[in-house]
């Protein structure tokens, strides 16, 4: 593979995460305007965004098999066509059914692109370099999550219709589409080059189960925590503005942490540092949940920094459980994380209703403790060390 080709594929991976981050995180900014557009209460409008998450989940799950049937370049180019149709649907339709369908299509495109982006990184880089590259790729999710809400605020403040926000997000996919030209993608399944030696199917092992449970509990815990921090902070007497600043600080330190750990991870065994970070994150979340408002800003900043590398390291270790990176395995771990996203309000909503926001935060803390236990148990069964030794020879 030529260096220019590798750079193009790496940028496609970066932008695939930026696309998903923009679509998921911008929701809160535009929901009120969309509710007004359709003359609906915000509470019922929020349910239609489930179509976005459902599209992401289904496409990540199915793409484990589709990757071996439909070439990656073809998928990305077809995704561009779907993106144009979805954004056009949002612009020219006044039907809630068509809006929901467009959201589902955006979710499908986003999920397919993100799963391809993840696979490209696991395919092109090996060992500890794979972990640092995946982490840097994941930072584009957070970066888009900071940039696109600012773009949305800029447009909405000037009374520009909400659907132009999605047109701006569509420009990310335009860049991906342009990068596919003159770019060679790894061939999979029936399109892969034939070899004389038969390819032995590798068993995944119990380590994949531990990692999948960790991925689900981590995302469910993280989103369950950050979704209810504003309500919890307001209950302690903080202003809405200060409560919002806590969330912004979390994502800012999360992004800085990703950049820092993309260098730090190269010098440590991934399973060991993952166990340490998961334990630290559980302790720091407990400090935040039981601390005074005066210490909240510092504890959420440190929590964001030290938890930033956990999810990507889980995916990296998953990809290292087999000698040859398996798209099905990587997508399975990703799917478990996406299920955590889907379950966020299903799990935390009733808890808040019955016991208040702090109970939801303590539940999230319990989920982080489960992540720590899974990462600790992984140390006894993980195959990443033997595969790293083989690739280094």
UniProtKB/Swiss-Prot annotation:
Q: Which family does it belong to?
A: Belongs to the major facilitator superfamily. TsgA family.
Q: Which PROSITE patterns match?
A: MFS (PS50850)
The membrane topology term of the UniProt record is: Multi-pass membrane protein
GO MF annotation: an example: transmembrane transporter activity
**Residues passing through the membrane, by range:** 11-31, 51-71, 78-98, 101-121, 134-154, 162-182, 206-226, 245-265, 273-293, 297-317, 332-352, 361-381
The cellular location(s) given in this protein's UniProt record come to: Cell inner membrane
The source's domain of life comes to Bacteria
State which gene encodes it.
Answer: tsgA
NCBIfam families given for it? PRK03699.1 (NF002982)
Q: One Pfam family for this entry, by name?
A: MFS_1
Q: What is this protein called?
A: Protein TsgA
């Amino acid at each position: 593979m030529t260096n220019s080709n590798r750079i193009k594929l790496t940028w496609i991976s970066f932008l695939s995460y930026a696309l998903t981050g923009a679509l998921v995180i911008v929701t809160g900014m535009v929901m009120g305007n969309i509710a007004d557009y359709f003359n609906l209460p915000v509470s019922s409008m929020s349910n239609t965004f489930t179509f976005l998450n459902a599209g992401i989940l289904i496409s990540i799950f199915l793409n484990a098999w589709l990757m071996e049937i439909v070439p990656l370049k073809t998928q990305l180019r077809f995704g561009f066509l779907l993106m144009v149709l979805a954004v056009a649907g949002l612009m020219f339709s006044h039907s809630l059914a068509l809006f929901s369908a467009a959201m589902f299509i955006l979710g499908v495109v986003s999920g397919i692109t993100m799963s391809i982006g993840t696979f490209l990184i696991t395919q092109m880089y090996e060992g500890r370099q794979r972990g640092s590259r995946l982490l840097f790729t994941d930072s584009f999710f957070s970066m888009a999550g900071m940039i696109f809400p600012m773009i949305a605020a800029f447009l909405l403040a000037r009374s520009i219709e909400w659907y132009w926000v999605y047109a701006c997000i569509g420009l990310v996919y335009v860049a991906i589409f342009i990068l596919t030209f003159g770019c060679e993608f790894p061939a999979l399944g029936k399109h892969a080059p034939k070899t004389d030696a038969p390819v032995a199917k590798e068993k995944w092992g119990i380590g994949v189960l531990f990692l999948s449970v960790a991925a689900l509990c981590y995302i469910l815990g993280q989103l369950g925590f950050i979704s209810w921090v504003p309500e919890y902070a307001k209950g302690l007497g903080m202003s809405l503005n200060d409560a919002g600043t806590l969330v912004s600080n979390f994502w800012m330190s999360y992004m800085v942490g990703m950049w820092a750990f993309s260098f730090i991870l190269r010098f440590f065994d991934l399973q060991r540092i993952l166990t340490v970070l998961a334990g630290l994150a559980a302790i720091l979340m407990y400090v935040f949940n039981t601390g005074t408002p005066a210490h909240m800003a510092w504890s959420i900043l440190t929590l964001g920094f030290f938890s930033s590398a956990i999810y990507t390291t889980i995916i990296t270790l998953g990809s290292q459980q087999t000698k040859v990176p398996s798209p099905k395995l990587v997508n399975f771990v990703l799917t478990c994380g996406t299920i955590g996203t889907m379950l966020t309000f299903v799990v935390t909503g009733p808890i808040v209703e019955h016991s208040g926001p702090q109970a939801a935060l303590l539940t999230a803390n319990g989920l982080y403790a489960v992540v720590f236990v899974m990462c600790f148990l992984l140390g006894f069964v993980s195959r990443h060390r033997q595969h790293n030794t083989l690739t280094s020879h």
